[in-house]
Regions:
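Short, compact, well-ordered microdomains
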Residues: 61-94
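A short beta-strand micro-motif
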Residues: 4-11
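Generic recognition of cysteine residues
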Residues: 5, 31-33, 60, 94
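Short, Lys/Arg- and Gly-enriched loop/turn segments at beta-strand edges
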Residues: 47-60
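A broadly conserved detector of short glycine/acidic/proline-rich loop/turn motifs that flank catalytic sites
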Residues: 11-13, 46
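Short N-terminal binding/cap micro-motifs at the start of the first secondary-structure element
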Residues: 14-19
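Short, flexible N-terminal segments of the mature chain
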Residues: 20-48
Length: 94
């Protein structure tokens, strides 16, 4: 059985006080990779393997690091959020 994993950007945040204090460019602004509502559909088939290719560069490496274990679980058909979310196939990550 083959499974898919949909990733949806629920919202983005900018913490200007942290940017101003810690970044080399304090006016860097919001992340340029994602916008609220962006949706990505990942597949893992013999013809297409989005997981190991990080979606051919369409995904931020830092964000991928934060969610990849959940994506891998979903692509295998598993659920890791049993009794945590109202749908055990759904995960919300920051």
């Amino acid at each position: 059985m083959q499974h898919e994993c949909r990733i949806t950007v629920l919202e983005t945040k900018v913490f200007e006080d942290y940017q101003e204090h810690y970044l080399a460019n304090p006016k860097s602004g919001p992340c340029p990779c994602f916008r609220k509502g962006d949706t990505f559909l990942l597949k893992r088939t013999p013809e297409r393997d989005d997981f190991y290719r990080l979606m051919d560069g369409k995904f931020c490496g830092e964000a991928w690091d934060a969610i990849s274990r959940y994506v891998y679980t979903a692509l295998q058909g598993g659920a890791i959020m049993h009794n945590w979310t109202n749908d055990e196939r759904m995960m919300i990550a920051c």
